[in-house]
C-alpha cells in the first residue's frame, strides 16, 4: 500500500488516501466483472444464433407474423370504411336493421345487427372470443333458431363488431377469412 502522510494543520491525510485506494480497487474490480458478464452474455447469444436454436426460430417467426398483421391494419381500415359506407346505405330508412335478428348462414345461425354508430355488422359474442355460431342439425332446425332467440334476449350486452374492433381484440378482422360470418355477410347481401 502506498503510504504518504500529509499533515496540514495537524490533520493526518493518510486515512483518506487509504480509503480512496480501496474505492479505486473496488471500481476496477466491478468494471472488470461487468465486462466479463457482458462478454459471457454476448458469447451465449452468439452461440444461440449460430446453433439454430428453436427459441430464436420461434421469435423470428413471431416477428414475421407481427409485421404481417401490422401490414393488414391499413387493409382493414380501408375495408372497414367501405363496409361502414355499405352499412349506411343498407340502413337508409330501415330502423329494424339495428335490432338483433337470427341470420341463417346455411350451416349455422348468428344473432346479429348493424351497429348504430359505425354501421358495421355486430354479433353477440361468445365470452371473449368471436360470435356465437349456433350450428344447425338439419336444413330447418327450430331448436337452433330457438337458442339463437334466447341469445338475443339474454346475451345481447356482449357484442363484437367486424373490422378494426375485431382486429384489435381477436387479431383478425373477419373480412379476409373464409368462411367467416363477416365476409359471408358481405357476400350474401
UniProtKB/Swiss-Prot annotation:
<keyword id="KW-1038">Host endoplasmic reticulum</keyword>
<keyword id="KW-0472">Membrane</keyword>
<comment type="similarity">
    <text>Belongs to the orthopoxvirus OPG107 family.</text>
</comment>
<keyword id="KW-0812">Transmembrane</keyword>
<feature type="topological domain" description="Intravirion">
    <location>
        <begin position="1"/>
        <end position="28"/>
    </location>
</feature>
<protein>
    <recommendedName>
        <fullName>Late protein H2</fullName>
    </recommendedName>
</protein>
<keyword id="KW-0946">Virion</keyword>
<keyword id="KW-1015">Disulfide bond</keyword>
<comment type="function">
    <text>Envelope protein part of the entry-fusion complex responsible for the virus membrane fusion with host cell membrane during virus entry. Also plays a role in cell-cell fusion (syncytium formation).</text>
</comment>
<keyword id="KW-1133">Transmembrane helix</keyword>
<dbReference type="Pfam" id="PF03356">
    <property type="entry name" value="Pox_LP_H2"/>
</dbReference>
<dbReference type="GO" id="GO:0019064">
    <property type="term" value="P:fusion of virus membrane with host plasma membrane"/>
</dbReference>
<dbReference type="GO" id="GO:0019031">
    <property type="term" value="C:viral envelope"/>
</dbReference>
<dbReference type="GO" id="GO:0055036">
    <property type="term" value="C:virion membrane"/>
</dbReference>
<keyword id="KW-1160">Virus entry into host cell</keyword>
<feature type="transmembrane region" description="Helical; Signal-anchor for type III membrane protein">
    <location>
        <begin position="29"/>
        <end position="49"/>
    </location>
</feature>
<keyword id="KW-1162">Viral penetration into host cytoplasm</keyword>
<keyword id="KW-0426">Late protein</keyword>
<dbReference type="GO" id="GO:0016020">
    <property type="term" value="C:membrane"/>
</dbReference>
<keyword id="KW-1169">Fusion of virus membrane with host cell membrane</keyword>
<dbReference type="GO" id="GO:0046718">
    <property type="term" value="P:symbiont entry into host cell"/>
</dbReference>
<keyword id="KW-1168">Fusion of virus membrane with host membrane</keyword>
<keyword id="KW-0261">Viral envelope protein</keyword>
<keyword id="KW-0735">Signal-anchor</keyword>
<dbReference type="GO" id="GO:0044167">
    <property type="term" value="C:host cell endoplasmic reticulum membrane"/>
</dbReference>
<feature type="topological domain" description="Virion surface">
    <location>
        <begin position="50"/>
        <end position="189"/>
    </location>
</feature>
<comment type="subunit">
    <text>Part of a stable entry-fusion complex (EFC) which is at least composed of proteins OPG143, OPG147, OPG155, OPG86, OPG94, OPG107, OPG104, and OPG099. Formation of the viral membrane is necessary for the assembly of the complex.</text>
</comment>
<dbReference type="InterPro" id="IPR005023">
    <property type="entry name" value="Pox_LP_H2"/>
</dbReference>
<keyword id="KW-1043">Host membrane</keyword>
Amino acid at each position: 500500500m502506498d503510504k504518504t502522510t500529509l499533515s496540514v494543520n495537524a490533520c493526518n491525510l493518510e486515512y483518506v488516501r487509504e480509503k480512496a485506494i480501496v474505492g479505486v480497487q473496488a471500481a476496477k474490480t466491478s468494471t472488470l466483472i461487468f465486462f466479463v458478464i457482458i462478454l459471457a452474455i454476448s458469447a451465449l447469444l452468439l452461440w444461440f444464433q449460430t446453433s439454430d436454436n428453436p427459441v430464436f426460430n420461434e421469435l423470428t417467426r413471431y416477428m414475421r407474423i407481427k409485421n404481417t398483421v401490422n401490414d393488414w391494419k391499413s387493409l382493414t381500415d380501408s375495408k372497414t370504411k367501405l363496409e361502414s359506407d355499405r352499412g349506411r346505405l343498407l340502413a337508409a330508412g330501415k330502423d329494424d336493421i339495428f335490432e338483433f335478428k337470427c341470420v341463417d348462414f346455411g350451416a349455422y345461425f348468428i344473432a346479429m345487427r348493424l351497429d348504430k354508430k359505425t354501421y358495421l355488422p355486430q354479433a353477440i359474442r361468445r365470452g371473449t372470443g368471436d360470435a356465437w355460431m349456433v350450428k344447425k342439425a338439419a336444413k330447418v332446425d327450430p331448436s337452433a333458431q330457438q337458442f339463437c332467440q334466447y341469445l338475443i334476449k339474454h346475451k345481447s350486452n356482449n357484442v363484437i363488431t367486424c373490422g378494426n374492433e375485431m382486429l384489435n381484440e381477436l387479431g383478425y378482422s373477419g373480412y379476409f377469412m373464409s368462411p367467416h360470418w363477416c365476409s359471408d355477410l358481405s357476400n350474401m347481401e
